[in-house]
């Protein structure tokens, strides 16, 4: 029946692509010289699957729905598309990006700024947990070309007219499924009402629940649909191991034994609950191991400091929860440890797929108790991948 969703899109299903053009080099995308410089300086060589497919229709001004997970290069896809379309001489906000978390919004802002480094484009992150007055002053002084933000704060700024929709020609919703599941639906609908009806809409989502389909149906015109399949998400190049710890209480000693190996590069350790993050951090500190920790109960300032230290390499081991798996994108991380296996298997790729993006090599180590064995097999089957017992010389692989 047609009421389930638009053509080619079933609720909770996988969308059907209706765009088959593939451009496999950034040079062939008709991008400006200064943008190309930024792309290559950022370390990209060849566009990823989603970039090969989605940048062109975005630049041509089509509404685009892309079904893709993090780790596929989706942020750069819309960042490049926005930067290509901005009129630099027009000192007005021309693109608006919404993201579900502050971390992700800041991450996107960093990518936009890095890629637009040689263009002089301005991009401001509009997020909760920061000083409203300072933000208002900034927006009033000079409207940034691009705003990236969380729905609540962005709507607030539009509503109070500190942010003008007049010249916004491109509206991007990143991780739309996450935003809607976090209860931002009303704010998102309100933001749509404030934008011009001819604003280009680009929507990215890992899954397509009915509330995401509703947005596409209500606010998008004849959208181009692009699917980047799960297997194009890289577990490739990532060596995955498990350690048989038998019992939960033996994980701590195992982690301490691994500590030397962790600090060869930078490592992220994933835990399933915030309280346990604090518990493990305390235990590690008590044994004189240096680790930093981050989770959703911390305030924004604290999280920023920790991320900064980790990005700069001054802190080497970060303990965190899934909430932040999507907001951590650290080039140097080549080791991920699942102290706890993820409670849902989709999160496995969010955790691991960061370690070795775009062919960067990485190692993932899963700590497995007796009870976890089934879950591990389940993950192997789901991703059609193999997870072997960790060899003794694991340090040589990192």
From Swiss-Prot:
The modification N6-acetyllysine is found at residues 110, 166, 185, 230. ATP binds at residues 68-75. It catalyses: ATP + H2O = ADP + phosphate + H(+). The keyword Signal does not apply. A motif (DEAD box) lies at residues 174-177. There is a cross-link at residues 138, 217, 230, 301, 361, 373 (Glycyl lysine isopeptide (Lys-Gly) (interchain with G-Cter in SUMO2)). Its EC number is 3.6.4.13. InterPro entries: DEAD/DEAH_box_helicase_dom, EIF4A_DEADc, Helicase_ATP-bd, Helicase_C-like, P-loop_NTPase, RNA-helicase_DEAD-box_CS, RNA_helicase_DEAD_Q_motif. Pfam families: DEAD, Helicase_C. It is found in: Cytoplasm, Perinuclear region; Cell membrane; Cytoplasm, Stress granule. Disulfide bonds: none annotated. One of its GO terms (biological process) is positive regulation of transcription by RNA polymerase II. Keywords: Acetylation, ATP-binding, Cell membrane, Cytoplasm, Helicase, Hydrolase, Initiation factor, Isopeptide bond, Membrane, Nucleotide-binding, Phosphoprotein, Protein biosynthesis, RNA-binding, Ubl conjugation. It is an enzyme of class 3 (hydrolase). GO terms for cellular component: cytoplasmic stress granule; nuclear stress granule; perinuclear region of cytoplasm; plasma membrane. One of its GO terms (molecular function) is translation initiation factor activity. Residues 237-398 form the Helicase C-terminal domain. Residues 55-226 form the Helicase ATP-binding domain. It comes from the Eukaryota. Coiled coil: none annotated. Belongs to the DEAD box helicase family. eIF4A subfamily. eIF4F is a multi-subunit complex, the composition of which varies with external and internal environmental conditions. It is composed of at least EIF4A, EIF4E and EIF4G1/EIF4G3. Interacts with PAIP1, EIF4E and UPF2. Found in a complex with XPO7, EIF4A1, ARHGAP1, VPS26A, VPS29, VPS35 and SFN. May interact with NOM1. Interacts with PDCD4; this interferes with the interaction between EIF4A and EIF4G. Interacts with RBM4. Interacts with DDX3X in an RNA-independent manner. ATP-dependent RNA helicase which is a subunit of the eIF4F complex involved in cap recognition and is required for mRNA binding to ribosome. In the current model of translation initiation, eIF4A unwinds RNA secondary structures in the 5'-UTR of mRNAs which is necessary to allow efficient binding of the small ribosomal subunit, and subsequent scanning for the initiator codon. As a result, promotes cell proliferation and growth. This is Eukaryotic initiation factor 4A-I. It comes from Oryctolagus cuniculus (Rabbit).
